[in-house]
Amino acid sequence: MFSLIGAKRLAIGIAALAWSTGAVMASEHWPDLPVGIKNGAAARIGNMAYVGLGSAGTDFYALDLNNPSKGWVKRANFIGPATNGAAMAAAGGKIFAFSGNGKATPDAKSPIIFDTAYVYDPGSDGWSKLDTQTPVGLSGAKAVGLADGRIAIFGGYNKELFDKYLADVGAIDKDKEPEAYRKLVDSYMGMKPEAYRWNDEVLVYDPAGNNWGSLGANPFLPNCDPAMATMGEGDFLLVSGEIKPGLRTPEAKLVKIRDGAAHWQKVSDLPPLSGSEPQEGVAGAYAGKAGDDVLVAGGANFKGAQANAAAGKWFAHDGLAKSWRDDVYAFDGKDWKVAGKLPRGLAYGAAFDAPGGLLVVGGEDRDGKARKEVFLLKWDGKALSVEN
């Protein structure tokens, strides 16, 4: 998740921030990324934030949240093919990257979903490929480290269907064969959500044993690119996301991992924006804790897709314009409210919890541009402000 445009306002003096390791001082402003990053992956180890891949190719960067004045530091390049939408999480002081999608080789005719896994060691500043394969496609999935050292993974596109669709699309010249191209797209995009066979298991990877397991099935429709926030040890909030290409859900679910199993509970949906604009849900939103609340910001959707799906038109986003949202919501554990606005519509960037707010890193704007900007959404439970 990641972005912002326009002139940076200078902070007067130096703001005091209390991070998990104690009180630290923020620089005059949060440093921009060296390059714009969208559809990338991110993780955090202590006070080090890591962001890369996606539109940055194999680039990988780190920011010391205790000393942001040092800026983003280039780390070792990712050693796999450039990938979008990888699931990434930290465990045992290392960072693990699973799946994603991209071209296996530069001359490949079409992208695929990868079934590979890699680990980054900050101590040696090096990547290694793991001797394992993901059980299913995990592009668009969310990964999170658990207290026992394992990594839980939610959602993910179906590799078999995704790979075949993109190969078939790549084999047709849509200018010379427009009818065949349209028929293929309509056939794939017109399926009901269940037909996409997205990952409906809560997978768990154990770095110590280099093996995979399951924490149980998701009782809801599996989704991809949801917003995710850690609520407490073993407690995670999954908000919105896609339930099929082009169609989001406004639902939010609380997942509690206890005694080797994932326990799901539906909580309040994202609220309607107004009486005339129903909640479409969002994919690629930014999320994290801000004090006692969870903030969910930005994301992208297609206005009108929910109405189309309700009418049985399952190619729900056909002919609709994609919208990059600037809405920010706050969740107090029971109810949602509209907290304010981002400086602009943004999606598919990175977010990190910070005292007093949510650090928003990069992302994609309404023009599809990968953004460099980094800013803090400050929230005191009543008012939202932006610290650049």
UniProtKB/Swiss-Prot annotation:
Subcellular location: Periplasm
Record field: catalytic activity: N-acetyl-alpha-neuraminate = N-acetyl-beta-neuraminate
Kelch-type repeats, residues: 48-92, 94-147, 149-186, 187-232, 236-285, 307-356, 358-387
Keyword Cell inner membrane assigned: no
GO terms assigned for molecular function: racemase and epimerase activity, acting on carbohydrates and derivatives
Signal peptide: 1-26
Cellular-component GO terms for this entry: periplasmic space
UniProt-listed NCBIfam families: muta_rot_YjhT, PRK14131.1
Quaternary data: Homodimer.
The protein's name: N-acetylneuraminate epimerase
Annotated source species: Brucella ovis (strain ATCC 25840 / 63/290 / NCTC 10512)
